[in-house]
């Protein structure tokens, strides 16, 4: 680190570090006087770092006055010796320094940093304008910069450093993934194209610094973007790069949403950059229109290098804009010799006003690819122009959907035929969709037939059935000409309506000996079956011909259906076709079966396309079986349409068959080509760059100690210094270690620059000659043996004169193997494999040697650094006055700059955080491993957090049984009882099926059965009260429940006995949906008390068990099945007293529920409350009378007393006593009451008296109507099971399901409360007292609850099972 300047006090320097960040390395610091208004000056401190300057106040505490990036500098003026004026984008600063040397030092540092960050660029160019007087000062600075030795730039011309500097300049966050992609992927691919599609997942604003770095980068020459809508800011940055960069050569912005204004601005940018190297422009798919293209055309005429590639397809051009463009192209003398690709397709150019375009094409030029498709331009006019200017180079001519304005009775222009007969380079002619009458077609074919310069021409005449294209007359022209054309290798005549003439046309096509690819699709649509068979027979004869050159046949979209099997059956023994396209024929599974049979024996086919054939899973399976036996087919695209349909009906078999087909294709397809340099570049990009970063880091530390100890005496110190210097030289040379090791001796075995053969190639060539000689001898012997065998079998025929010699002579040509075959096999296949293996071994050895040597260098450097550090520390103890120097030397840990908004450090900064002692071979390998892992994209972090979204979904484990009930919606007359043992073995397969809501309201008679329900079960009697529970709704408090029984450790015997079988069934329900519903559908223990479980993260909390309760529960469980009741949630208001308790209860509920969401309270008006209260009182009187009559009518041997227990919520719960009639709650046996009674008692033990009440209670009110009697309202899923989800519990003949009262929310005991349960029972609230409170009325009840809620903290202990945790206020929504 640089020594502190003498004119900057130490205290001030410490304050400056606090302002700009202590881990930012300060390179230069100078005291300056900043000129302000007038002649007034202020004392400031100028601090320079690697890419930014800071101007701070010269007092303590210091304050940041101004900061600017070196890239913001627009000019530096030094007209006075000690004065420097810096011009930036924001302001101008005039600073006076102590001496002229200080000015030179500041400028020298800025220039050095710019040269290091932007290699290949002069600092004077980046700073734009530097003026110094006298001029010798600037010359000395330039000489200083030129004399500095720069390190090798990083990957892709040091793009990552430039990107970081530009992010600092523009104030954008640094994206590590951009740096990783460029330094790794781009380096490995050795590409010079920066594709914005690679970063399309980032925000548009993050693309700005990536593009801005191209202004200074000397590696990338192409900027491309396709189908990516670019924002205005991104477009502005692209324009800036175009206007300033002389390295950018290709600009591709296809379908980027650009408009006229961008084209005009691009023209301005080109005008601003006279040294532009741009020669390729692709603006296809952007609505530039005539105005935009006209502006660009002016600059096209001035491009210093001319245009090579111009694509303006689909840019809304008219003939006027095209004329303007072609006029400008003609004005540039370089265009005639440089332009090779011109694409104006997709623009409406119909009409005769294209004179400038025709003139441009008529001039001698070098256009190789001309695309005027979909322009409706005049075909004969274009060909006439091409005849004069494009005969030498034009290879690809696309004039599809153009217009041939030929009138019947007039001759075809001779230039049309002459162009095709005179062209020297045409290989592709596309006239599809063009209206061609027989005369132009004949001229075209005869022109090609007369041209002996062309070879391998591809002619596309598809879809020419647009009027009088190829009907009859056209077919006859084809028949008369096609057989003699020798230079057409690919012919597409599909979709031309040739049905009636196809039979004879195929005969003539079979006589052509040059066509290798033939497309006949969409020509069979209107043919009858009797006419189709002869056509297909002729086609079969054509492909079965031994001398047929045909290699590819397309019958796509011909709708041949079963008739296509005629062709398929001929494929089995076919020896010429390598590609067949039978898609779109609807052949079905039978056709697939035939294709499978053909593939089992065919060894020539390499490609089969077979989509849109209505093939099902069975057809795919047949093909998969055939592919197992086929080892030559290599390309068989997945039939997407058929596969999509088959996956809907039979996904398992379809997926299995498709996977098998792909596996067999992979087996057949063997890739031999290997990029030998790709693995080397990847090794160099990741391993070597990371290693060199570590070496550079430790070398800096060693060099600091060398500088500090160089003047010290002592033999030991001097010896260590010399050893360190030798190690530094080795470390510097190690940067080229891997390249030198990898390329050493390359010319000796791989050939020197490809001019001479390598020893391996020479050996293989000599071997090929020897193998060819041996093969020829073997084949001759084989021929002689065959003729001898023929004489033995047919001696009479073979005795004829000269027959033997004639057979041998005729067979010699057929049995010989081309001499180039063996050579190609050995050199191109075996030779490539050998060379690839050698390259792999060479890279492995070079990497191993380089890695071991670098490990030794790192180890030695670390040891040397420790020795020098020890010397320095001992020396520092003897020289305390140099303490400030030691502080500066130690302070080298970089951090995030305060100016930068960078959240993540780069790899270099992370390496700088390592201590020197950690720079070992082990840490190097760990760093390399980290370097190979691509950073997580920020774009994903901005999406939803999947872990957070799933944290509330319960883990799919077997839930403990919950208290649950079942509402029976059917009338008692329709219930058929089953024996209890029989019921346990039955399984309700439709229990998950949603049930229809009842539309008919319950009758009044059913309402009256709330007091006494007969044995046959009248459960619907509880549903008739619409206004039931209104007072509880406004007075009840939300409290915790003490019926938590989810813990398996605290489960009683009755929870395990009846729930085991159901738990086994529930455990088999898996999947994400059942996972969420698992808690709501869990089995609950039998009870008559309606409760809801509110789970807590800390486990279940329940009241202490009672011995008598357990005994009674076991007895009841042994005797019969429990009753099921329906659980009905009652919304309860939150009041000032119980607000916290309600919040805790709901918080526990939200944690336990799968959704964990908030619930809300419905609010009802006071007028409705009063009206419903009056109805409630009248019905209560009726119910009391009915209950009295029913009690009198019961068996006198079973006296009962019905008690209700009022809890804090204001709800009432039936309290069963021994004297209560057995039919009171739908049970005709004492076991039912014995089973239900302890459940209520035990469940309410913490809130009620332990002793049995002696006074009777008032009669029960009508309970709240069930949800089935209300309009169905969508509700959030809750923890409690729904009636539709709860399975039917088995019961005996006398145990019908009974719908009881609404549930009450009860407090869950905490650990502290549970310990004090026994003592709290000394002052219980009796059931008679609770009953008397029930008869007060709403007002007294409300006051009583307020009093109880205000003092319940002292009575009841903890309010929440999770004590100490602040509950959040949540509500219940019904």
Curated annotation (Swiss-Prot):
SUPFAM superfamilies found in the cross-reference section: RNI-like
UniProt feature, compositional bias: Basic and acidic residues: 1040-1064, 1108-1132, 1141-1150, 1232-1244, 1343-1356
GO BP terms: actin filament network formation; barbed-end actin filament uncapping; cell migration; establishment or maintenance of cell polarity; lamellipodium assembly; macropinocytosis; negative regulation of barbed-end actin filament capping; positive regulation of actin filament polymerization
UniProt xrefs under Pfam families: Carm_PH (PF17888), CARMIL_C (PF16000), LRR_6 (PF13516)
Low complexity bias spans: 1245-1263, 1317-1330
Acetylation in keyword set: yes
N-acetylmethionine modifications at: 1
Residues in LRR repeats: 245-269, 275-298, 304-327, 336-363, 391-418, 423-447, 485-510, 547-570, 574-597, 658-682, 962-985
Region (Disordered): 961-982, 1040-1374
Biased composition (Polar residues): 1191-1204
Phosphothreonine modified-residue sites: 920, 1229
Subunit structure: Homodimer. Interacts (via C-terminus) with heterodimeric capping protein (CP); this interaction uncaps barbed ends capped by CP, enhances barbed-end actin polymerization and promotes lamellipodial formation and cell migration. Interacts with MYO1E. Interacts with TRIO.
Function: Cell membrane-cytoskeleton-associated protein that plays a role in the regulation of actin polymerization at the barbed end of actin filaments. Prevents F-actin heterodimeric capping protein (CP) activity at the leading edges of migrating cells, and hence generates uncapped barbed ends and enhances actin polymerization, however, seems unable to nucleate filaments. Plays a role in lamellipodial protrusion formations and cell migration.
Protein name per the record: F-actin-uncapping protein LRRC16A
Gene designation per UniProt: Carmil1
């Amino acid at each position: 680190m640089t020594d502190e300047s003498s004119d900057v006090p130490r205290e001030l320097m410490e304050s400056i570090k606090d302002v700009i960040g202590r881990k930012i390395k300060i390179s230069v610091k100078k005291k300056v006087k900043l000129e302000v208004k007038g002649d007034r000056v202020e004392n400031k401190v100028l601090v320079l770092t690697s890419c930014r300057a800071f101007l701070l106040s010269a007092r303590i505490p210091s304050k940041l006055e101004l900061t600017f990036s070196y890239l913001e500098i627009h000019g530096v003026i030094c007209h006075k010796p000690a004065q420097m004026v810096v011009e930036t984008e924001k302001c101008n600063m005039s600073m006076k320094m102590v001496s002229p040397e200080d000015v030179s030092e500041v400028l020298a540092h800025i220039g050095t940093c710019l040269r290091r960050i932007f290699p290949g660029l002069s600092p004077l160019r980046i700073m734009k304008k530097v003026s110094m007087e006298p001029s010798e000062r600037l010359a000395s600075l330039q000489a200083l910069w030129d004399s500095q030795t720069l390190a090798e730039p990083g990957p892709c011309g040091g793009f990552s450093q430039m990107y970081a500097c530009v992010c600092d300049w523009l104030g954008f966050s640094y994206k590590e993934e951009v740096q990783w992609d460029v330094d790794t992927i781009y380096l490995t691919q050795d590409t010079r194209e920066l594709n914005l599609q690679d970063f399309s997942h980032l925000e548009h604003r993050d693309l700005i610094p990536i593009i801005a770095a191209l202004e200074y980068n000397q590696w990338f020459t192409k900027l491309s973007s396709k189908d990516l809508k670019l924002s205005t800011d991104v477009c502005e940055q692209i324009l800036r790069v175009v206007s300033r960069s002389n390295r950018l050569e290709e600009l591709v912005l296809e379908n980027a949403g650009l408009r006229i204004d961008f084209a005009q601005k691009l023209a301005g940018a080109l005008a601003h950059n006279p040294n532009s190297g741009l020669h390729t422009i692709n603006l296809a798919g952007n609505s530039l229109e005539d105005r935009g293209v006209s502006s660009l055309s002016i600059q096209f005429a001035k491009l210093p290098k001319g245009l090579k590639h111009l694509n303006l397809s689909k840019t809304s051009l008219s003939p006027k804009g095209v004329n303007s463009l072609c006029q400008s192209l003609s004005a540039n003398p370089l265009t005639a010799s440089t332009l090779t690709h011109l694409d104006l397709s997709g623009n409406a150019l119909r009409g005769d006003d294209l004179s400038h375009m025709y003139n441009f094409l008529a001039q001698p030029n070098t256009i190789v690819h001309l695309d005027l498709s979909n322009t409706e331009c005049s075909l004969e006019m274009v060909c006439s122009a091409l005849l004069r200017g494009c005969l030498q180079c034009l290879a690809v001519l696309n004039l599809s959907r153009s217009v041939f304005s030929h009138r019947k009775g007039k001759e075809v222009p001779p230039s049309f035929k002459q162009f095709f007969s005179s062209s020297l380079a045409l290989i592709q002619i596309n006239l599809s969709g063009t209206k061609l009458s027989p005369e132009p077609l004949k001229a075209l074919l005869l022109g090609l037939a007369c041209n002996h310069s062309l070879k391998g021409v591809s002619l596309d005449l598809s879809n020419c059935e647009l009027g009088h294209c190829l009907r009859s007359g056209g077919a006859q022209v084809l028949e008369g000409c096609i057989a003699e054309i020798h230079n057409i290798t690919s012919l597409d005549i599909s979709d031309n309506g040739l049905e009636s003439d196809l039979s004879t046309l195929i005969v003539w096509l079979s006589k052509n000996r040059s066509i290798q690819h033939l497309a006949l699709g969409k020509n069979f649509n209107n043919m009858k079956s009797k006419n189709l068979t002869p056509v297909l027979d002729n086609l079969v004869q054509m492909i079965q011909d031994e001398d047929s050159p045909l290699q590819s046949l397309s019958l796509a979209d011909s709708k041949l259906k079963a008739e296509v099997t005629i062709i398929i059956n001929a494929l089995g023994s076919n020896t010429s076709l390598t590609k067949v396209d039978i898609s779109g024929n609807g052949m079905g599974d039978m056709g697939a079966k035939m294709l499978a049979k053909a593939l089992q024996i065919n060894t020539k086919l390499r490609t089969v396309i077979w989509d849109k054939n209505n093939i099902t899973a069975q057809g795919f399976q047949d093909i998969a079986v055939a592919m197992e036996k086929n080892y030559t087919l290599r390309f068989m695209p997945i039939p997407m349409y058929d596969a999509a349909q088959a996956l809907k009906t039979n996904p398992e078999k379809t997926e299995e068959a498709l996977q098998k087909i792909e596996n067999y294709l992979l087996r057949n397809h063997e890739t031999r080509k290997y990029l030998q340099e790709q693995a080397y570049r990847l090794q160099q990009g990741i391993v070597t760059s990371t290693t060199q970063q570590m070496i550079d880091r430790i070398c800096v530390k060693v060099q600091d100690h060398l500088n500090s100890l160089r003047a010290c005496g002592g033999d030991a110190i001097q010896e260590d210094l010399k050893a360190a210097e030798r190690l530094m030289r080795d470390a510097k040379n190690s940067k080229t270690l891997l390249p030198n090791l990898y390329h050493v001796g390359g010319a000796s075995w791989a050939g020197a620059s490809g001019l001479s053969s390598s020893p391996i190639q020479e050996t293989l060539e000599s071997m090929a000659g020897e193998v060819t000689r041996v093969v020829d001898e073997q084949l001759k012997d084989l021929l002689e043996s065959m003729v001898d065998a023929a004489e033995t079998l047919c001696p009479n025929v073979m005795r004829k004169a000269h027959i033997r010699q004639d057979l041998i002579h005729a067979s010699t040509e057929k049995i010989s193997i081309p001499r180039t075959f063996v050579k190609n096999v050995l050199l191109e296949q075996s030779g490539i494999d050998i060379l690839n293996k050698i390259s792999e071994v060479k890279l492995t050895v070079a990497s191993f040697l380089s890695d071991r040597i670098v490990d030794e260098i790192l180890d030695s450097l670390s040891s040397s650094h420790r020795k020098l550090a020890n010397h320095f520390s001992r020396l520092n103890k003897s020289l305390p006055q140099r303490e400030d120097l030691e502080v500066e030397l130690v302070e080298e840990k970089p951090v995030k700059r305060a100016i930068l908004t960078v959240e993540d450090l780069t790899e270099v900064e992370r390496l700088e955080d390592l201590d020197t002692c950690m720079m070992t071979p082990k840490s190097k390998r760990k760093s390399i491993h980290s370097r190979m892992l691509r950073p997580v994209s920020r774009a994903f972090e901005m999406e939803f957090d999947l872990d957070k979204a799933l944290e509330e979904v319960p883990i799919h484990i077997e839930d403990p049984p919950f208290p649950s009930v079942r509402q029976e919606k059917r009338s008692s007359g329709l219930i058929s009882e089953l024996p209890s043992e029989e019921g346990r073995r039955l399984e309700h397969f439709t229990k998950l099926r949603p049930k229809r809501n009842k539309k008919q309201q319950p009758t009044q008679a059913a309402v009256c059965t709330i007091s006494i329900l007969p044995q046959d079960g009248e459960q619907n009697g509880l549903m008739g009260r619409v206004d039931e529970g209104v007072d509880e709704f406004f007075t009840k408090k939300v409290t915790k429940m003490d019926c938590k029984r989810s813990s398996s450790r605290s489960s009683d015997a009755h929870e395990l006995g009846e729930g085991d079988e159901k738990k086994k069934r529930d455990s088999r329900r898996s999947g994400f949906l059942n996972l969420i519903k698992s808690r709501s559908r869990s089995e609950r223990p039998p009870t008559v008390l309606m409760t809801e479980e509110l789970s807590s993260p800390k486990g279940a909390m329940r009241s202490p068990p009672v011995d008598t309760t357990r005994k009674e529960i076991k007895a009841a469980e042994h005797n019969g099945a429990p009753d099921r009741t329906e659980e009905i949630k009652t919304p309860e208001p939150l009041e000032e007293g119980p607000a916290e308790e309600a919040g805790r209860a709901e918080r526990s509920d939200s944690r336990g529920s799968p959704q964990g969401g908030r619930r809300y309270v419905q609010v009802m008006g006071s007028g409705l409350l009063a009206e419903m209260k009056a109805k409630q009182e009248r019905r209560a009187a009726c119910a009391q009378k009915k209950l009295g009559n029913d009690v009198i009518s019961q068996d006198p041997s079973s006296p009962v007393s019905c008690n209700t227990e009022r809890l804090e919520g204001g709800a009432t719960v039936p309290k069963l006593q021994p004297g209560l009639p057995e039919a009171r709650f739908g049970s005709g046996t004492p076991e039912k009451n014995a089973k239900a009674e302890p459940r209520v008692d035990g469940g309410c033990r913490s809130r009620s008296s332990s002793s049995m009440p002696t006074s009777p209670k008032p009669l029960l009110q009508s309970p709240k109507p069930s949800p089935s009697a209300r309009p169905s309202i969508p509700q959030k899923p809750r923890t409690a099971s729904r009636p539709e989800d709860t399975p039917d519990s088995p019961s005996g003949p006398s145990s019908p399901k009974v719908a009881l009262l609404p549930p009450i929310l009860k407090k869950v005991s905490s650990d502290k409360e549970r310990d004090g349960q026994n003592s709290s029972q000394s002052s219980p609230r009796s059931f008679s007292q609770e009953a008397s409170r029930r008869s007060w009325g709403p007002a007294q009840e409300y006051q009583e609850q307020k009093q109880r809620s205000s003092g319940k903290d002292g009575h009841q202990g903890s309010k929440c099972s999770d004590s100490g945790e602040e509950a959040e206020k949540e509500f219940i929504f019904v």
